[in-house]
Design a protein with these regions (language model features):
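Short amphipathic alpha-helical interaction segments
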Residues: 71-86, 228-255
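Structural detector for internal amphipathic alpha-helices that build alpha-solenoid repeat scaffolds
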Residues: 210-213, 321-325, 331-342, 353, ...
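Alpha-helical adaptor scaffolds
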Residues: 337-339, 399-445, 451-452
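Amphipathic alpha-helical scaffolding segments comprising HEAT/armadillo-like alpha-solenoid repeats
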Residues: 240-242, 316-317, 344-356, 377-388, ...
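Short, amphipathic alpha-helical interface elements at domain boundaries
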Residues: 1-225
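C-terminal engagement modules used by replication, chromatin/transcription, nuclear envelope/ESCRT
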Residues: 242, 248-309
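Alpha-helix N-cap/helix-start positions at coil->helix boundaries
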Residues: 325-329, 360-363, 391-395, 446, ...
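Exposed, interaction-prone assembly regions rather than primary DNA-binding/catalytic cores
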Residues: 167-187, 193, 198, 203-210, ...
Length: 496
């Protein structure tokens, strides 16, 4: 996942490291890896690459409590062992390359290496939560690498006459497959944080598959695109089954009956298009641990993936700059945490100072500042009164004082009213674009000012032209909209 393909994301609400570490230790695959690491000893034999020799897999599976009659038990044990080795929970000494077949074992045996609990195993019980999470992230990388590998059936189909894998026939590119899975997880993360930033939203598999396949701006998908969505769904169904045991996701697989239909004669597009019961087509949810893990990988890739609360120790300038790009609810949560750790009067003074500026981001900073001031009580009044005479802040200061029933609030000059109107609409345009509510706001702000558009074009605000052009498009009163367009023309003519 690249930083270029993912601009600043909404903030995610993470559980504490202690809670996440408990989740990691409870993830089935990680827990099995820990148990096998403790099981490893002098009698443990490994082959080249550190894998358990085949005749020890039944004993490993039995130690894990897996059903001996389950044909997948040996595979589960092998995967858990590989995770233990890759994370450093187990140290292996591979067989010497020139070892004689009769060296370490009986005559005719393949040479083998040895294994023992690794130094990192102690971190599971004696390490800090961050140590446990570091081990879990290493385990996650192993599982992600496995999930990007074709399944056994595809590998068998790609064998040539000599028993070697024909990669051209397989049409498998390791880098491409890893990039695909990275993008899937990044999209899943984005879909999750866009709705509040918590791990409680299930995403239908067709929605996630479509996000990978359907071109931006496409209206009705073509049959060819729907078939690509169906293929992507089947691919993701297999991958999420592999990712669930490490605790990354909660996954409801595609209904087996639908899988059978897809394998028979049902049109492939129908698999993605039928909305009768979307849950039958698979549902996936990033767990709290999954949100943590994917965010950590995105940060390593240079993606700006903020977390709620990480601005609490920074200044008001950093706070307002950051929350200006957040959805309103996420901004509110971040502001509340920032305010909670400060003296209200000092916090308000710092916020007002940071809200100044005639740059492009100024209106939205002042909107978020106003959002923060709503949390302050009477103790903030002196700091608010101190900016009453300022063109940029005097308007919002009067609004706050009026809302709090303060006495002796001076009436604003007409120029300040016009300036505040432009600033308010500019902030709304920057925050949400041309929403359905914006025309009503425009009507409300201009209704009580006779000759509003005869005056507002003279306002010395960097967004005057942009605001008037928007009012010309959106104002619900056609006469007022025409006046706004004329005012925008006058405002443009004043610019050098």
């Amino acid at each position: 996942m690249s930083a270029e393909s993912h601009p600043t994301l909404p903030p995610v609400r993470l559980h504490s490291d202690a809670e996440l570490a408990r989740d990691a230790l409870g993830a089935p695959l990680f827990a099995r890896a820990v148990r096998l690491a403790r099981w490893a000893g002098p009698a443990t034999r490994v082959g080249v690459g550190g894998e358990l020799v085949a005749d020890q897999l039944p004993a490993a599976a039995a130690h894990l409590g897996l059903d001996a009659g389950d044909e997948d038990a040996a595979g589960y044990a092998s995967q858990a062992w590989r995770v233990a080795v890759d994370t450093g929970l187990v140290d292996v000494a591979e067989p010497e390359e020139d070892a004689d077949a009769e060296g370490p074992g009986e005559a005719g045996e393949e040479p083998h290496g040895t294994a023992a609990p690794g130094e990192d195993l102690a971190l599971v019980t004696a390490g800090a939560p961050g140590d446990v999470l570091g081990l879990w992230r290493a385990a996650l990388e192993t599982v992600l690498a496995d999930a990007a590998v074709p399944d056994l059936e595809d590998l068998v189909d790609a064998l040539d006459e000599g028993g070697e894998i024909d990669f051209d026939r397989l049409d498998w590119n390791p880098g491409r497959e890893a990039d695909f899975l990275d993008e899937v997880l990044a999209n899943l993360y984005l879909l999750t944080v866009a709705e509040g930033g918590t791990a409680d939203r299930q995403i239908p598999l067709p929605v996630l598959a479509a996000s990978m396949v359907v071109p931006d701006g496409m209206g009705e998908p073509t049959d060819a695109v729907l078939e690509q969505v169906s293929d992507a769904m089947m691919r993701l169904d297999d991958q999420f089954r592999q990712l669930e045991p490490i605790g990354l996701v909660d996954f409801r697989p595609v209904d087996e009956e639908l899988m059978a239909q897809a394998d028979e004669d049902a049109p492939r597009g129908d698999l993605a298009a039928d909305e009768e019961d979307v849950s039958r087509y698979g549902m996936v949810r990033l767990t709290p641990l999954g949100l943590y893990g994917i965010r950590a990988r995105m940060l390593e890739a240079g993606v700006d993936a903020p977390a709620v609360g990480e601005l609490a120790g920074k200044g008001a300038d950093a706070l307002l700059d950051a929350v200006s790009s957040y959805p309103e609810h996420a901004a509110q949560v971040e502001i509340e945490q920032w305010m909670a750790g400060r003296e209200p009067a000092d916090a308000v003074a710092e916020l007002l100072s940071a809200a100044r500026g005639d740059d492009e981001g100024g209106p939205l900073r002042r909107l978020r500042c106003q959002q923060a001031l709503a949390l302050a009580g009477p103790e903030a009044e002196p700091a608010v009164r101190s900016v009453l005479d300022e063109a940029e802040l005097g308007g919002l200061a009067r609004v706050w004082l009026a809302e709090h029933g303060a006495a002796d609030v001076p009436a604003p000059a007409p120029e300040m009213v016009f300036w505040l109107t432009v600033d308010t609409i500019a902030a709304q345009l920057a925050a949400d674009g041309e929403t359905e509510e914006l025309p009503l706001l425009m009507e409300t702000l201009t209704a009580h000012h006779t000759g509003f558009f005869d005056q507002v074009w003279r306002v010395e605000h960097p967004s005057t032209v942009q605001v008037l052009e928007a009012m010309g498009r959106l104002h619900p009163d056609r006469k007022r909209a025409k006046e706004a367009r004329r005012a925008a023309f006058k405002a443009r003519s004043r610019r050098p």
